[in-house]
């Protein structure tokens, strides 16, 4: 699987976990040169608190396009140390 945005590969791995239709990639597959810090947080009733990264590719910013659960609930333990994408990031 590959995650792309603005013409660049953001992450690539054959080891993804699908939860609620989203592919969670290993955090180690994320190309850190495209990642910027975000203070954004959200909460899921069964997964826990999500943290976010933004993407910066060729001068274009995609805020909060990457999310992860640093301490997922026991029910969501399979997504620990994994990241998922939205906001126009194509996963195929």
Q: What feature does the model see in each segment?
A:
Residues 1-92:
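Terminal leader/tail segments of proteins
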